[in-house]
């Protein structure tokens, strides 16, 4: 094997190893990148009743579809997204490139985000990250703010409203909590 081929293979395997480690880390502390179905995104945004001047947050924004759809629905909102999976983050940056004035994206963990200005938070997270941050949500979010969680409940919280599942389309429930 030539030295050039050897080094190209080493670079390829190194990049693959880093990619796999980052993916494993993201899955351990949050959730894997699984985009919410478009119909669910629309339902969640409709349920949030977005108004001019509101701030919305997606703590695991993935490819940015929730934030982008929210901004198209109500152009006078501010949208903030956090993502740990680099490929999804890059995809979100690309998809939201024409909405930079409305959408701010961060490549970091949302556990340390400032929630004091958030009016609505859209979640498609597993039970553990929701439970881990439940006290933060309750103490930092505005009174009257909404948390809309697709598929997973916040342990120990009573939902304000539940949008029923649609089994024939493989859609889970949407749990809406009011602070």
Task: Kindly give the residue locations of the regions a language model identified.
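C-terminal substrate-binding/active-site "lid" region of AdoMet-derived donor-dependent transferases
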Residues: 129-179
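Conserved SAM-binding loop of SAM-dependent methyltransferases across substrates and taxa
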Residues: 65-75
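Conserved SAM-binding loop
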Residues: 92
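A short SAM/SAH-binding and catalytic strip from SAM-dependent methyltransferases
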Residues: 118-132
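Conserved class I S-adenosyl-L-methionine
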Residues: 53-62
């Amino acid at each position: 094997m030539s030295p050039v081929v050897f080094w190209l293979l080493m670079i390829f395997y190194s990049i693959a190893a880093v990619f796999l480690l980052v993916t494993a880390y993201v899955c351990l502390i949050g959730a894997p990148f699984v985009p919410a179905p478009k119909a669910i995104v629309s339902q969640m945004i409709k349920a949030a009743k977005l108004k001019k001047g509101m701030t919305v947050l997606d703590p695991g924004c993935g490819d940015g579809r929730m934030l982008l759809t929210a901004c198209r629905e109500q152009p006078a909102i501010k949208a903030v997204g956090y993502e740990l999976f680099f490929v999804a983050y890059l995809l979100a940056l690309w998809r939201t490139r024409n909405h930079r004035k409305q959408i701010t994206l961060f490549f970091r963990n949302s556990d340390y985000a400032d929630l004091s200005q958030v009016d609505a938070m859209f979640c498609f997270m597993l039970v553990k990250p929701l439970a881990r941050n439940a006290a933060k949500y309750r103490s930092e979010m505005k009174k009257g703010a909404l948390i809309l969680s697709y598929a997973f409940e916040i342990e120990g919280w009573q939902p304000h409203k539940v949008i029923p599942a649609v089994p024939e389309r493989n859609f889970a429930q949407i749990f809406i909590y009011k602070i």
